[in-house]
């Protein structure tokens, strides 16, 4: 894997505003930290998902997790993992009013990631990692599939700019608790957070400071959350288990690496751009 650009690239940041042109590198970095980051100014090319995807070499052996009807990468070196077959994905897309031809023609691996026995230069997922009931085991499984030096390319929702805004950030303790429990389904807490505490999902409104009205129907929402939790053995209910911002994600991954739970380290981490509800990261297998 090529060396990713830094979190703050002074040249990229200076190019966003002629008023910044005279700043040297140190001053540009300081200015971004003091002003640009909170405004969502792009300070690195890989802050944008399209550039993150372009950074993955076309000749790299790649596994994309959860493509559904919009695979991010296509080509002879790309394989897909999903919980549904290609035919099931097309049927689901049709029911949702989505063109089924947008789905991949073939899903190479149907079910869990643990079934895969080959290795890859890169693994890619978008808005997937936050759904994993056991984050540590997921990262361990991805690490197992990566060749030494390979990268896990991630597009992750930033909880500040999506419907998770009012839900507290995830903690290291919570991540390790899930690992110790070998959690495979979402908890009652995750159900309550999703059905009771979520708000609108318009990132521009969130960037402007409009996070929605105070939730007034919590009683009915809570009753619904309990009902959905009771049905969890009948069908899989998909909610977020984890709520990240770039600093929180960095701290959790770094600590998991430090204590030996994973062999992945952060090779690149990029703050969200204005109007978007996601940030990008690259984890690299170190051994």
Show where each model-derived region lies:
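S-adenosyl-L-methionine-dependent methyltransferase catalytic module, highlighting the catalytic core
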Residues: 100-102, 106-113, 137, 141-143, ...
């Amino acid at each position: 894997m090529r060396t990713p650009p830094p979190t703050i690239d002074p040249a990229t940041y200076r190019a966003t505003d002629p008023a910044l042109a005279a700043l040297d590198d140190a001053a540009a970095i300081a200015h971004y930290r003091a002003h640009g980051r909170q405004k969502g100014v792009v300070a690195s090319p890989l802050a944008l998902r399209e550039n993150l995807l372009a950074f993955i070499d076309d000749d790299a052996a790649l596994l994309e997790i959860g493509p559904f009807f919009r695979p991010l990468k296509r080509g002879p070196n790309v394989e897909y993992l999903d919980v549904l077959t290609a035919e099931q994905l097309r049927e689901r897309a049709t029911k949702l009013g989505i063109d089924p031809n947008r789905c991949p023609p073939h899903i190479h691996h149907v079910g869990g990631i643990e079934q895969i026995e080959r290795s890859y230069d890169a693994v890619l997922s978008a808005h997937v990692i936050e759904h994993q009931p056991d984050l540590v085991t997921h990262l361990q499984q991805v690490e197992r599939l990566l060749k030494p030096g390979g990268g896990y390319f991630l597009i992750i929702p930033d909880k500040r700019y999506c419907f998770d805004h009012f839900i507290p950030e995830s903690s290291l303790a919570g991540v390790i608790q899930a690992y110790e429990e070998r959690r495979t389904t979402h908890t009652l807490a995750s159900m309550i957070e999703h059905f009771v505490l979520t708000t609108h999902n318009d990132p521009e409104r969130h960037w402007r400071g409009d996070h929605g009205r105070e939730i007034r129907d919590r009683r009915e929402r809570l009753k619904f959350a309990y009902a959905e939790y009771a049905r969890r053995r009948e069908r899989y209910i998909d909610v977020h288990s984890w709520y990240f911002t770039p600093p929180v994600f960095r701290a959790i991954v770094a600590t998991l690496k430090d204590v030996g739970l994973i062999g992945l380290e952060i090779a690149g981490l990029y703050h969200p751009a204005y109007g978007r509800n996601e940030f990008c990261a690259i984890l690299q297998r170190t051994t």
